Each structure stands twice: as structure tokens, then as C-alpha cells.
């Protein structure tokens, strides 16, 4: 779809467009005739105020090169003009979240979501360990840290990397000034997703809280677990002076204590190679219609249990039947 056609559509009352807008240039060009009103209808096409090719034929969304006009969400007009195709607005009303304590005495998981600006949505999961202090700190301060960086840094992958490192540094200062010595061993995973303009999805993570994108019934991995099982992570830990030991269940741990190689917090393991620098991933997430729905799932490691990505994907796809659902 041409950008010029979209701009013309917006100027011609695009804010009233829903599923099908019909316009006619002949009526617009003839000043002697009365200006017709716009119609939003799924019935037979009517005359319209303009057409994209000057042929005088009634115009619909299909005339603008859109192969699927079954868009159920409101349209983000500025991003649609920018990218040259209609982009559905993702509302926070379509965001679902839940937390269950399971068999633990204390729930150390935290989650958050917010609309940071007109263009950017924020989603986050923090799975704490060694107490909830680090997860609570991220839950309280990460959103503001990202907000402060948004005007300065346009690259969202770089922005999230800076935010993770700043939060880790701030938590370190907070813990060392505190009289509570347990803060030195408190840590958390962090998986944060930013959605800009309804189309640019960027995910950053440390630890093993996974994020996947469910698309057409198939899972797309957005994160990779940071564990000593990864050869590159294991080698990095050793080069930093740490070691990997296996417990009675055959699970590798950094210095025999931590099951992940990257986290926010865990200050007592910083000199052993446990870092807060995230790995990031950026994709375009544009969808059309309910048949091509997209669901992003961000889940702490413990919630996955024995399930594989494909099984989690199937379960969530059945639960979120509408397009643009987020969890």
C-alpha cells in the first residue's frame, strides 16, 4: 500500500474508518454537488469521496494493497503511514497475567506491564531467588529507568541493555548501603519486552525466564536460557574465575550455588562471572485478522516444568483466541 494513499485517507476522515471505508473522487471534485457522508458497513459498497487511482471506482481497504481486510482492532494511523501498511492498536485490555505460588512458602515472582508512551508498550517478568528483594527492586524501578532512556536512545536493544546494567548497578548500591546482609545473595531473572508502533518487538533477558511468540500455532523462541549448560556461558564463567558444579540431580550450578549464569543481583557471584548484560532479540510483529493471531508469552522458568515450547504455545493459543493478545 502506498504511503501517499494512506495519508490521503487520513486527511479524508480516516478516523471514522472501521473495517471498510468507501470513498469517491467524482463527488469530491464536483463542487456543485452535495458532499456525501462516509459509510462504515460490511454490506454492498457505496459511493465514496475519493479513489486511489483516479478511476472513479469505489475504494476499499483492498484497493490499498491490503491482502486481508479482516482487522478487528483499531488502526494506529501514524505508524500505518510510517510503515505503509495498516497496523492494529494493541490495547492493554488485551494483556493477561497471572502468578501462582506453587509449593513455595513465598512467591518471589513479579510481573509488570504499562504504556510508556503513545508508541511504546512495556511487559516484564522477574523471577526472584534468594528472597524477593532483587525482583521487587526491578519491579519498582525498571519501568522508570526505561522511561528516562527513551528520549535519549532510539535503538530499543541498546536501550534495554543500558537499563539492565543501570538497574543492576543501582541494586548493588542499595544492597551495600543496607543493613540487611541477605540482599547480597538476592537475585532475579529479568525478561522485558518493548513493543513500539505495534510492529517492532524487542526482547531482552537475563536468566531463564523464557519468552516465546505464538504465531499461527507455531512457537518462535525469543530468548535463550542463560545456564551453565551452555558451552559459551560455561567457558565465560571459568575465564572470570568461577567454576561449575553439579548437584545430586545432575544440574549444573555456578560455584555450586546458582543455576543461571546471568541475573540482576547475586552480588556475591559478580566476581565469578555472573553478569547482568542481557541478550536481545528484535523482530517485526505485524499481523492481519484473527486467523493470523499473535500471542507473546513470558513465563518464569518454574512454570514451564516438563512442558516444551510447542505444548505451551498450543495451550496459550487456545486461551487467547483474539488477535494481539499478550501474556
UniProtKB/Swiss-Prot annotation:
| Residue ranges of domain PPM-type phosphatase in the record | 94-327
The record's catalysed reaction(s) read: O-phospho-L-seryl-[3-methyl-2-oxobutanoate dehydrogenase] + H2O = L-seryl-[3-methyl-2-oxobutanoate dehydrogenase] + phosphate; O-phospho-L-seryl-[protein] + H2O = L-seryl-[protein] + phosphate
Q: What Enzyme Commission number(s) apply to this enzyme?
A: 3.1.3.16, 3.1.3.52
Q: Where is the transit peptide?
A: 1-29
Residues the entry annotates as binding Mn(2+) 1: 127-128
Q: Which residues form a coiled coil?
A: none
Q: Name one GO molecular function term.
A: metal ion binding
What InterPro entries does this protein map onto? PP2C, PP2C_BS, PPM-type-like_dom_sf, PPM-type_phosphatase-like_dom
Primary residence: mitochondrion
Q: Which keywords accompany this UniProt record?
A: Hydrolase, Magnesium, Manganese, Metal-binding, Mitochondrion, Phosphoprotein, Protein phosphatase, Transit peptide
GO CC, sorted alphabetically, is: mitochondrial matrix
Residues of the region (Critical for association with the BCKDH complex) are 46-61
Q: Which domain of life is it from?
A: Eukaryota
Name positions with the PTM Phosphoserine. Answer: 248
Q: Which family does it belong to?
A: Belongs to the PP2C family.
What this chain does, per the record?
Serine/threonine-protein phosphatase component of macronutrients metabolism. Forms a functional kinase and phosphatase pair with BCKDK, serving as a metabolic regulatory node that coordinates branched-chain amino acids (BCAAs) with glucose and lipid metabolism via two distinct phosphoprotein targets: mitochondrial BCKDHA subunit of the branched-chain alpha-ketoacid dehydrogenase (BCKDH) complex and cytosolic ACLY, a lipogenic enzyme of Krebs cycle.
Q: How does it assemble?
A: Monomer. Interacts with E1 and E2 components of the branched-chain alpha-ketoacid dehydrogenase (BCKDH) complex; this interaction requires colocalization in mitochondria. Interacts with BCKDHA but not with BCKDHB of the E1 component. Interacts with the 24-meric E2 core composed of DBT monomers with a 24:1 stoichiometry; the N-terminal region (residues 49-61) of PPM1K and C-terminal linker of the lipoyl domain of DBT (residues 145-160) are critical for this interaction, whereas the lipoyl prosthetic group is dispensable.
Q: What is this protein called?
A: Protein phosphatase Mn(2+)-dependent 1K
Amino acid at each position: 500500500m502506498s504511503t501517499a494513499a494512506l495519508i490521503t485517507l487520513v486527511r479524508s476522515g480516516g478516523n471514522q474508518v472501521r473495517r471498510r471505508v468507501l470513498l469517491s473522487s467524482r463527488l469530491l471534485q464536483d463542487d456543485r454537488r452535495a458532499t456525501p457522508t462516509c459509510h462504515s458497513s460490511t454490506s454492498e459498497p457505496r459511493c465514496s469521496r475519493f479513489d486511489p487511482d483516479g478511476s472513479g471506482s469505489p475504494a476499499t481497504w483492498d484497493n490499498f494493497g491490503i491482502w486481508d481486510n479482516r482487522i478487528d482492532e483499531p488502526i494506529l494511523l501514524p505508524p500505518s503511514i510510517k510503515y505503509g501498511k495498516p497496523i492494529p492498536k494493541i490495547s492493554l485490555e488485551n494483556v493477561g497475567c497471572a502468578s501462582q505460588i506453587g509449593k513455595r512458602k513465598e512467591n518471589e515472582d513479579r510481573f509488570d506491564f504499562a504504556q510508556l508512551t503513545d508508541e511504546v508498550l512495556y511487559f516484564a517478568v522477574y523471577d526472584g531467588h534468594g528472597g524477593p528483594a532483587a525482583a521487587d527492586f526491578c519491579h519498582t524501578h525498571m519501568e522508570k529507568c526505561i522511561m528516562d532512556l527513551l528520549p535519549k536512545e532510539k535503538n530499543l536493544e541498546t536501550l534495554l541493555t543500558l537499563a539492565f546494567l543501570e538497574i543492576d548497578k543501582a541494586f548493588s548500591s542499595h544492597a551495600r548501603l543496607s543493613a540487611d546482609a541477605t540482599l547480597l545473595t538476592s537475585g532475579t531473572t529479568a525478561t522485558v519486552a518493548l513493543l513500539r508502533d505495534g510492529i517492532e518487538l524487542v526482547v531482552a533477558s537475563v536468566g531463564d525466564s523464557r519468552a516465546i511468540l505464538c504465531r499461527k500455532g507455531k512457537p518462535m523462541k525469543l530468548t535463550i536460557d542463560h545456564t551453565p549448560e551452555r558451552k559459551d556461558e560455561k567457558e565465560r564463567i571459568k575465564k572470570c574465575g568461577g567454576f561449575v558444579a553439579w548437584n545430586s540431580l545432575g544440574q549444573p550450578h555456578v560455584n555450586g550455588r546458582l543455576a543461571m549464569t546471568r541475573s540482576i543481583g547475586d552480588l556475591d557471584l559478580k566476581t565469578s562471572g555472573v553478569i547482568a548484560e542481557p541478550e536481545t532479540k528484535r523482530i517485526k510483529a505485524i499481523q492481519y485478522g484473527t486467523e493470523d493471531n499473535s500471542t507473546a508469552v513470558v513465563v518464569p522458568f518454574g512454570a514451564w516444568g516438563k512442558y516444551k515450547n510447542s505444548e505451551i504455545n498450543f495451550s496459550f493459543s487456545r486461551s487467547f483466541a483474539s488477535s494481539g493478545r499478550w501474556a
